[in-house]
Amino acid sequence: MNSSFSAPAKKSLGQHFLADRYYIDRIVQAVDPRAGQHLVEIGPGQGAITFPLLRRHGALTVIEFDRDLIAPLTEVAAPIGALSIIHRDVLSVDFTALANGTPIRLVGNLPYNISSPILFHALDHAAAVADMHFMLQKEVVDRMAAGPGSKVYGRLSVMLQAYCEVTALFVVPPGAFRPPPKVDSAVVRLVPRDPATVQINDRRRFADVVRAGFGQRRKTLRNALSTICEPAHFDAAQVRPDARAEQLEVADFIRLANVELA
């Protein structure tokens, strides 16, 4: 049963509403909600994923910025289950406070125009997040899951993989959306790593090293990091200064950022 409703997509908000039942079902199966879990959907849109999740789980929190969608979401959800709506910009939502001691499971068809900021915002609250299932542009998912040596391996790959296990699940074609986007989409699963296993001494320092390394990716690390790393940093971290950022494993970046010279 499809309980979603029709509403015009707003280009200014980067809206593309999922409409294909096959892919809706695949996403719900991938999330596989269980009793007692706290599900939070970012950008429910017309409710394509919202209502199947609500029907299966009984309770759901959604974060929606478009005020025109609040009333129809509330109306359609009423006979299905308990829907709690947060009408705010997702980047202003404190996921840690929302979790309130029970790790949340984040789900969403993320707006293409702000997908990366949302990902980094979720990372800031990783300790309060059990897992994430997001649909994004396929090229973004490819970058998220890429490994060293890949042309698309970069800052996003390292920053996300340092804190999460990243798994690309499946591709969703443009025809599954209304209106159809110009590119393929893909669904990705992110599972935050146990904080005790993420040995990053200074998150800001780590982010600076990764940003600088990939900021001039064709340069050697010696040159790209010349303002923030001395030769002794490379020696202590056992990282070759003549290597390029795209050749380093995530663990290499972590070791390099963790070096503290006397």
UniProtKB/Swiss-Prot annotation:
Pfam families: RrnaAD (PF00398). Gene3D superfamilies: Ribosomal RNA adenine dimethylase-like, domain 2, Vaccinia Virus protein VP39. It catalyses: adenosine(1518)/adenosine(1519) in 16S rRNA + 4 S-adenosyl-L-methionine = N(6)-dimethyladenosine(1518)/N(6)-dimethyladenosine(1519) in 16S rRNA + 4 S-adenosyl-L-homocysteine + 4 H(+). Belongs to the class I-like SAM-binding methyltransferase superfamily. rRNA adenine N(6)-methyltransferase family. RsmA subfamily. GO terms for molecular function: 16S rRNA (adenine(1518)-N(6)/adenine(1519)-N(6))-dimethyltransferase activity; RNA binding. GO terms for cellular component: cytosol. It comes from Xanthomonas euvesicatoria pv. vesicatoria (strain 85-10). Its EC number is 2.1.1.182. The keyword RNA-binding applies. PANTHER family: DIMETHYLADENOSINE TRANSFERASE, DIMETHYLADENOSINE TRANSFERASE-RELATED. InterPro entries: KsgA/Erm, rRNA_Ade_diMease-like_C, rRNA_Ade_Mease_Trfase_CS, rRNA_Ade_methylase_Trfase_N, rRNA_adenine_dimethylase, SAM-dependent_MTases_sf. This is Ribosomal RNA small subunit methyltransferase A. SUPFAM superfamilies: S-adenosyl-L-methionine-dependent methyltransferases. Its main location: cytoplasm. It is found in: Cytoplasm. Keywords: Cytoplasm, Methyltransferase, RNA-binding, rRNA processing, S-adenosyl-L-methionine, Transferase.
